[in-house]
Amino acid sequence: MFIDEVIITVKAGNGGDGSAAFRREKFVQFGGPDGGDGGKGGDVIFVADSNINTLIDFKFKKLFKAQNGENGQKKQMYGKKGEDLIIKVPVGTQVRDFTTGKLILDMSVNGEQRVLLKGGKGGYGNVHFKNSIRKAPKIAEKGGEGAEIKVKLELKLLADVALVGYPSVGKSSFINKVSAANSKVGSYHFTTLEPKLGVVRLEEGKSFVIADIPGLIEGAHEGVGLGDKFLKHIERCKMIYHIVDVAEIEGRDCIEDFEKINHELKKFSEKLAGKKQIVIANKMDLIWDMEKFEKFKSYLAEKGIEIYPVSVLLNEGLKEILYKTYDMLSRIEREPLEEETDITKLLKELKIEKEDFEIIRDEEDAIVVGGRIVDDVLAKYVIGMDDESLVTFLHMMRSLGMEEALQEFGVQDGDTVKIADVEFEYFE
């Protein structure tokens, strides 16, 4: 099954907490702080793999998490680093933020590895908080939280040439003839239900890639038929083969066919309509009215579009097109890729920032202190409930501006102040 769009959530590993352990050994009276640092959380890494050609592996599993780092231990032992999460995707996969649609990663080169999210930093053990005044700190740092983001994976096939045209004009037969592709061929509409890639190999190592795009019909850009589901795969191609049934086997006019398909391309994207296009006039072996063919040829000449009469069935006229195409491709620059968004900046934009200090009175008339600074400190440190640790915590909050915020709120001597699980009476 060909799946080219999925929505998943990815999360980097959390860092392990630092340890607040103390050295306790026989004959060592004052062991001192002995807690090791936590291990770093695992990263989320995307890898482009040419052996994969669909996003079906993401159809049923929607949450992907890297491993957390392990906590630090006594004897200053570091926690083990969390294992990185490797996510393999087809070459041509774009990773976009689900909320904003911004491009984060464009996996366009086989084998490239890109870090999407970095794991949280491991927290410091209490040995880092020892100083000349605080010789036995009972405080340690929590591990940093691994970033999490909801993303849309979108596969856009990387081919040099895209085959477009109405259903049953011979696109699949063409790609099978000129490459090793194995597209299904049938005498009914929409025989090809998903894009297929084929490599055209000429002599002396010359080659290029063709994408067989499922047949388009009028109204495709609005979802008619197979709709615009696969039009995006043409966006990265350098040029277009527009295959037309000039024998008009199904009773349609070939000029109208040509105009309608180009109308659909333009409605989907001006970029598609502006791509270099050559017309392959197929089924010349079945044509009965050469006058209509000459009319079509003159019509295209007025527009400056090249036409190549061929019979795919009889293998006539194909070689000339392939060599001409190779020469043309060497002169066409691939369009520059869309600029990627810096993931660090994006995560900051998506984060809802609180005020530094958010202060209210509760139903018991106590002053409750919260806000971004409080959240950050509580998230960052493992704080013991002994007197020394609580004093250290309050000194930390005071240095970060809590007292000024309380005074601005209108705190009075004797007021009860609550911060998380800490409660105290305020005196200036």
UniProtKB/Swiss-Prot annotation:
Gene encoding the protein: obg
Taxonomic lineage per UniProt?
A: Bacteria, Fusobacteriati, Fusobacteriota, Fusobacteriia, Fusobacteriales
Domain OCT, first and last residues per copy: 349-428
One Gene Ontology cellular component: cytoplasm
Could you tell me which Pfam families the record lists for this protein?
Answer: DUF1967 (PF09269), GTP1_OBG (PF01018), MMR_HSR1 (PF01926)
Location of the OBG-type G domain: 159-330
SUPFAM superfamilies named among the record's database cross-references = Obg GTP-binding protein C-terminal domain, Obg GTP-binding protein N-terminal domain, P-loop containing nucleoside triphosphate hydrolases
* Any single GO BP term: ribosome biogenesis
Name of the protein in question: GTPase Obg
- Sites where the protein binds GTP: 165-172, 190-194, 212-215, 282-285, 311-313
The keyword Metal-binding belongs to this UniProt entry's keyword annotation: yes
Question: Highest taxon of the source?
Answer: Bacteria
Its EC number is 3.6.5.-
Q: What does this protein do?
A: An essential GTPase which binds GTP, GDP and possibly (p)ppGpp with moderate affinity, with high nucleotide exchange rates and a fairly low GTP hydrolysis rate. Plays a role in control of the cell cycle, stress response, ribosome biogenesis and in those bacteria that undergo differentiation, in morphogenesis control.
Q: Where is the Obg domain?
A: 1-158
What does the subunit section of this Swiss-Prot or TrEMBL entry state?
Monomer.
Subcellular localization is given as: Cytoplasm
Which residues bind Mg(2+) per the record?
Answer: 172, 192
Q: Which family does it belong to?
A: Belongs to the TRAFAC class OBG-HflX-like GTPase superfamily. OBG GTPase family.
Q: Which UniProt keywords apply?
A: Cytoplasm, GTP-binding, Hydrolase, Magnesium, Metal-binding, Nucleotide-binding
Identify the main location. cytoplasm
Q: Name one GO molecular function term.
A: GTPase activity
